[in-house]
Amino acid sequence: MRRVFACVCVLGCLSTSAQEARKPAPRDPGPDSQYRLGPDSMPQEGVPKGEIKGPFTLPSQAYPGTQHTYWVYVPAQYDPAVPAALMVFQDGQAFKNETGDMRAQNVMDNLIYRREIPVMIGVFINPGRRPDQPEPTPRNWGDRDTNRPTEYNTLDDRYARVVTEELMPALAKDYNISKDPEMHGIGGSSSGAIAAFTVAWERPDHFRKVLSNVGSFVNLRGGHVYPEKVLAAEKKPIRVYLCDGRNDNRGMRNGRYDETRDWFLQNVRLMKALQQKGYDVNYAWGMNNHGQKFGGAILPDMMRWLWRDGPVSTDPNDAVERDFRRPAVKKD
């Protein structure tokens, strides 16, 4: 009887071992698996919601034959009598996507309400396209069928002209936006990030805050030379937050390594050049791939840091300062 029992146990163990062997090996967590949006990126009960207006179409003089689609975020606290700050996001469709990784409108709603950033007009602008080309979407950002590569990756002032000479005058017709360049920020992801940096680099008299997520400071159209440009040029009055990941595109092409196309390396190089030159620069290096998971998770912190020096009252009797920002009173 003991022998029979022993045989049964052995067979049972063998059967269990065979079943375990057939199970797929546990998958390693992906580089983006640890990043989640926090409460600052979600709609919160009691927080006034801003309004997104648009889409609007802006014909371009800088790139004849093309047009830019954009949307305008107007916070509930916007008062036309008070000049507002300005934040411009490239690849606007991705930054305003309600189910995407950034959800910038929610971030602005929450941080404005808590006085952690100033009241600001937000702009979500897409790359230019001809009228016969498709509008970029969260699935197709337009690299193959719009003017995105030319506008965003080229190191010249043409896209800066779109923002400063075409977009900003259009906004000024409808909104009271501060003329102080310290109150103007610009940001983006990937090629949209280097585009944002280039706008501030070319026009620091208009933009002085740059938000860069997985910025394409690589040799797509010469962006890898920015560290050398920073070191060679006179220091400019801009503040920069760089965000990238160790698993971004790392420069392997056809089995060969090309450091000029290593996103992470080139972001680190730019950070070091900015530090060496004495710029006001902050940075965060994650584990992320080339995308917006990490950038979206820390977007509230990036915005707080960029806009940290807004005016503040220290009067203990200032009841307004010690209260949340309430919606502006609508005037008839």
What is the role of each PLM region?
Residues 6-13:
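Bacterial N-terminal signal peptides
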Residues 19-332:
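Non-catalytic cap/lid and distal C-terminal segments of serine-dependent acyl enzymes
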Residues 1-4:
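Positively charged n-region of N-terminal signal peptides that target proteins for export
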Residues 14-18:
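Sec/Tat signal peptide C-region and signal peptidase I cleavage site
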